[in-house]
Amino acid sequence: MGLNKLRNKATHWDKVGRIGFKKSPPDILAEHKKKTHLHLLARWADLKGSERILKTDLFEEAFGSDQFLFDLGQKSSRIIGIDISREIIAQAKRRASQHSVDSSQYLCCDVRYLPLKSDSMDLIISNSTLDHFPSEKDISIALKELARALRVNGTLILTMDNKHNLTYPPYTFIRIWMKLGLAPYFIGRTLSLAELRRILEQEGLSVEESTAIFHYPHPDGLVRWTERFLRKLSRGRLDSAIRRGLALLDRLEGKRTKYLTGRYIAVKAVKHEA
């Protein structure tokens, strides 16, 4: 990718970061996302506290109550967080200090071009980072780079938009949505589970676990708006009911139809010796 394109991408996320900071009040959906991510890590990563961990963007840590890296940071000091936006990194560092978490290794870089040594990371967490690229080729480049940075027997836990969700629209509609200014940020391409598995295997990783998480419809903004509207209308009296509703929807992960209802696909992939 050319230097100008990299700059434009960083500028876009800087703008999103400034808006996100102003418009990101705590919400139940974000609380639910954090809980789900931590549960997924507990299931798929046997963390001892000494692992070298990489998280591939810092958007939640900068602005959202769905952040979970600070929770990991209180147990381990060997965490690297990256983001293409200096605005997002600066805000993530401010919030990290409020949680007494070391942010000295929060780096500004593109996930496709990591300033990391090969075979250096024990665990890589990539939650909905790679579905913000304009092409599947960009996703493949990023996956190749993550595989390079991961050590042998290291684990990659990755989530992406689920294109087989019954409410996932054709990408033409997504483009129109963005042109109308209805999307808060750039919505990129994604991969099916089969496509993701194939690329990971080409890069020397085997998918040991897969699932679908967050069983609610597209787009996220509509779900958040509905939640906030109900909370405001009921003056908080529906908060418990909303939490119970999200917990009930989580049960769909145990159904055979989970890939039709899950908002994201999630995989655990392990790197093996060449």
Identify the residue ranges that each predicted region occupies.
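Conserved class I S-adenosyl-L-methionine
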Residues: 1-54, 157-179
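Acceptor-substrate binding/catalytic loop of class I
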Residues: 32, 179-195
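Class I SAM-dependent methyltransferase SAM/SAH-binding core
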Residues: 54-113
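A short acidic, Gly/Pro-enriched loop at the edge of an enzyme's catalytic core
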Residues: 112-124
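A short SAM/SAH-binding and catalytic strip from SAM-dependent methyltransferases
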Residues: 123-137
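A short glycine-rich, Lys/Arg-flanked "PGG" loop and its adjoining helix->strand segment in the class I
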Residues: 140-152
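A C-terminal cap/extension of S-adenosyl-L-methionine-dependent methyltransferases
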Residues: 209-274
